[in-house]
Regions:
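Residues at secondary-structure transition points
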Residues: 27-30, 50, 54, 100
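Class I SAM-dependent methyltransferase Rossmann-like catalytic core
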Residues: 41-53
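Residue-level signal for short amphipathic helical patches enriched in basic/charged
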Residues: 50, 69, 91
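N-terminal, positively charged/glycine-rich alpha-helical extensions of SAM-dependent methyltransferases
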Residues: 2-42
């Protein structure tokens, strides 16, 4: 029985590759910011549902390995839509500051 999984994975990989190529081929910081601003509304769906992004969980694992959540202060530089901060908060970290160059990404993070 063919569930079409391989076809879906190829399509998703193609989308992921296309976005990465756009990011790598930007000519200026402003162009890169515009790209992330345009992507912000669908970023979480792309990285979580489509690509299976595990960065937040890996970050939580390693921070727990080296830090105690009580009293720890975390700076999430390049926080995007706040995916890491949400996961860290669920893992007991309470003092998390996020910064990002994209105002649209920060607006998405503020919703969380």
């Amino acid at each position: 029985m063919n569930c079409g999984c391989a076809k879906t994975q190829r399509r998703n990989l193609g989308k992921q590759t296309a976005i990465h190529e756009q990011v790598l081929n930007t000519k200026s910081t402003d162009e890169l910011m515009d790209l992330y601003d345009d992507w912000a509304a669908r970023y979480d769906q792309d990285v979580n549902d489509t690509w299976g992004y595990s960065g937040p969980e890996r970050t939580l694992f390693w921070l727990h390995h080296y830090l105690s959540p009580e009293g720890a202060r975390v700076l999430d530089a390049g926080c995007g839509t706040g995916l890491v901060a949400v996961t860290l908060s669920k893992g007991g970290f309470r003092r998390i500051d996020g910064v990002d160059y994209s105002k649209a990404m920060l607006a998405e993070a503020a919703k969380k």
